[in-house]
């Protein structure tokens, strides 16, 4: 029988579990329920919620009826102006923003009000980063690579406040901070990478290093799953990114005696178990 090692940290993190539970709870009520963007980056969960009457909207402008309407803010969070727009609509607001993300909103708001330049380490077009940018009172700088950090110019003596997308690669964040520190900037470094993310990345790398092949399970739009794939790929050449069991070609695994499995923060446990059972028993 093939040896299969599944990461203990694989699957829903605290913030995602909290957000998903909140949506399912609202779906049981009589109100019309909408999420502002997909609640998490997992197609299976979003489709299941749709069956229960929960619809996805892309913008506050998509709200046509206000009475008996509940709008759920997803775990990634939103800019402050979106919160204000929802309040003006007078709809019922359920804020499922991850508490770790909400903490970043407070940090950047205060730092920018104090006159500091906010540097966000993360993917500029990721919804979490879009939300963080929207809590800065002055324009922040977003970087996601060491080369971008090298190109940053002097800020005229202004103090920098550095934060990170919660799901960013910890090693890359540290490398970027090291580069900015060597430029002699006056900086406040706030390591806002979620502990669960750091633990997940470390464990995934360790398992990949010890396995003949590695499976990374998660939504194709999931940033944290993509980062897991990058980490595992560096440690194990035979690393595969799948969303569900349907994406798995077991013919690729015939010669592998040991297979590691990890999953992104938006991957339900039932999908992980299904893949684990199939790989172990085939």
Task: Report the location of each language-model feature.
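The feature marks the mature, well-folded catalytic cores of soluble enzymes
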Residues: 1-282
């Amino acid at each position: 029988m093939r040896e299969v090692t599944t990461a203990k940290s694989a699957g829903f993190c605290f913030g995602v579990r909290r957000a998903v539970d909140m949506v399912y709870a609202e779906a049981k009520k009589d109100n019309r329920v909408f999420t502002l963007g997909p609640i998490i980056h997992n197609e299976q969960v979003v489709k299941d919620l749709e069956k229960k009457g929960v619809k996805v909207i892309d913008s506050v402008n998509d709200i046509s009826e206000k009475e008996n309407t509940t709008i759920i803010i997803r775990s990634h969070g939103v800019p402050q102006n979106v919160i204000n727009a929802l309040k003006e609509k007078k709809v019922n607001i359920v804020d499922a923003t991850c508490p770790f993300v909400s903490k970043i909103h407070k940090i950047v708001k205060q730092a920018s009000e104090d006159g500091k330049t906010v540097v966000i380490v993360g993917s500029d077009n990721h919804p979490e980063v879009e939300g963080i940018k929207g809590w800065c009172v002055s324009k922040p700088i977003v970087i996601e690579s060491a080369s971008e950090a090298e190109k940053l110019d002097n800020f005229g003596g202004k103090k920098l406040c550095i934060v990170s997308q919660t799901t960013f690669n910890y090693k890359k964040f540290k490398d970027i901070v090291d580069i900015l520190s060597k430029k002699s900037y006056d900086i406040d470094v706030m390591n806002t990478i979620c502990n669960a993310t750091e633990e997940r990345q470390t464990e995934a790398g360790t398992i990949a290093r010890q396995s003949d092949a590695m499976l990374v399970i998660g939504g194709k739009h999931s940033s944290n799953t993509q980062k897991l794939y990058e980490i595992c790929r560096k440690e194990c050449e035979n690393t595969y990114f799948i969303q569900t069991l349907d994406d798995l070609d077991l013919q690729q695994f015939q010669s592998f005696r040991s297979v590691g499995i990890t999953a992104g923060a938006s991957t339900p446990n039932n999908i992980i178990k299904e893949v684990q059972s199939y790989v172990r028993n085939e």
